[in-house]
């Protein structure tokens, strides 16, 4: 298998044995005061470092009237990508005096949450390394993103595309419902040369996290990074991101899932990957596993109020073992402000305890607890005096 990226040097080495194809200190950036218990022995840690590739985005968030989404052809609870007919939605949001500019994007939200839950501090943490890989434009949005990452203790490995603008996402909120309008600009333009020039830094990480949204334009980079990490016997984590993404890029998701050790999805995304509807959970997992290369693989699946399922495929026996179903704590409807970022925060909380080597029960509890905090705020942000205890 050879790289299709058009440069003599590939992201991965050929291997015939491989059979897989000024900083804002406002509430938006406030570090929570977290009480947690680290493993007594670092030998218990599953992962010391994590790098994620995805779309660095600034969310432009504002309350809107109900008729605004009809005006621009948007849908509550769904994502519609920006085009000429709906790009005016951003001006509609910015007319609101309470509009907020929040560093966001699925992977950025997850990494910042993970770092917060690990109690990481900018430039001081010697135990863990968390890095975001991507691309931005040369503008004020880039500065906002880098400031937010650094304040959370996350390193940036962000290519600067001078002639493009940083990606943005319009977030309209009305009666606790939301609509999303991402405009993916510079983040789609990351160059393979930038990846190759930074391979040493990338190789220093124990695990790779892939944002499903990112494969839309940069699938080859994702595939080759997956192969490189697997050749080095490192961990690959894949998020499915959205039902329409799995529908549109089904074969690509299947190939990336073949490399993955952990697959993160909600129930609807899992059904789309299995090409089955209304099946029992066990049947869905088995159907998916039959489509993939036989290897150890974890599934972490969120299903709203029905909780979180963690399941493990035993390739030697050809069976699917359900490890647990974790339930979120109920949140009063009047306390819910914005559901945007809840899933990202869940994954961040889950991964923080996974890195520490904690039980899957502890991982799910952390994810659910953090998501419960996030939905009480606008975007993936924490209140000033946020405290949480992740002890088993």
Where are these regions (language model features)?
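Cofactor-binding loop segments of dinucleotide-utilizing enzymes, especially the Rossmann-like FAD-
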Residues: 53-55, 134-138, 173-175, 183, ...
């Amino acid at each position: 298998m050879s790289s299709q990226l058009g440069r003599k040097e590939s992201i991965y080495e050929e291997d015939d044995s491989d059979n897989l194809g000024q900083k804002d200190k406002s509430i938006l950036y406030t570090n929570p005061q977290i009480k947690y218990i680290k493993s007594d022995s670092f030998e218990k840690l599953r992962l010391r470092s994590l790098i994620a590739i995805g779309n660095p985005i600034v969310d432009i968030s504002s309350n809107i009237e109900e008729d605004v989404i009809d005006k621009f052809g948007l849908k509550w609870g769904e994502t519609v990508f920006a085009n000429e007919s709906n790009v005016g939605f951003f001006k509609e949001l910015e007319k609101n005096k309470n509009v907020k500019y929040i560093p966001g994007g699925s992977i950025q939200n997850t990494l910042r949450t993970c770092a917060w839950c690990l109690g990481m501090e900018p430039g001081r943490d010697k135990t863990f390394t968390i890095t975001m890989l991507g691309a931005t434009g040369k503008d004020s949005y880039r500065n906002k993103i880098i400031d937010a990452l650094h304040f959370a203790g996350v390193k940036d490995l962000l290519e600067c595309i001078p002639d493009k603008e940083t990606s943005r996402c319009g977030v309209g909120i009305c009666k606790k419902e939301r609509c999303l309008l991402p405009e993916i600009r510079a983040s789609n333009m990351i160059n393979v040369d930038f990846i190759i020039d930074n391979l040493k830094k990338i190789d220093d990480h124990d695990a790779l996290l892939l944002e499903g949204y990112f494969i839309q334009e940069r699938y080859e980079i994702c595939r080759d990074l997956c192969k490189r990490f697997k050749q080095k016997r490192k961990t690959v984590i894949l998020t499915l991101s959205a039902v329409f993404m799995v529908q549109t890029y089904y074969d690509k998701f299947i190939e990336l899932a073949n490399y993955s050790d952990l697959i993160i999805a909600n129930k609807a995304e899992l059904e789309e990957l299995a090409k089955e509807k209304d099946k029992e959970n066990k049947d869905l997992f088995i159907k998916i596993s039959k489509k993939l290369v036989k290897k150890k693989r974890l599934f972490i699946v969120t299903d709203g109020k029905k909780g979180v399922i963690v399941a493990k495929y035993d390739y030697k026996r050809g069976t699917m073992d359900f490890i647990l179903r974790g339930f979120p704590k109920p949140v009063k409807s009047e306390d819910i402000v914005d559901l945007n970022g809840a899933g990202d925060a869940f994954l961040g909380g889950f991964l923080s305890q996974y890195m520490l080597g904690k039980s899957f029960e502890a991982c799910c509890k952390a994810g659910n607890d953090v998501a419960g905090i996030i939905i009480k705020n606008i975007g993936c942000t924490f209140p000033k005096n946020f405290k949480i205890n992740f002890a088993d």
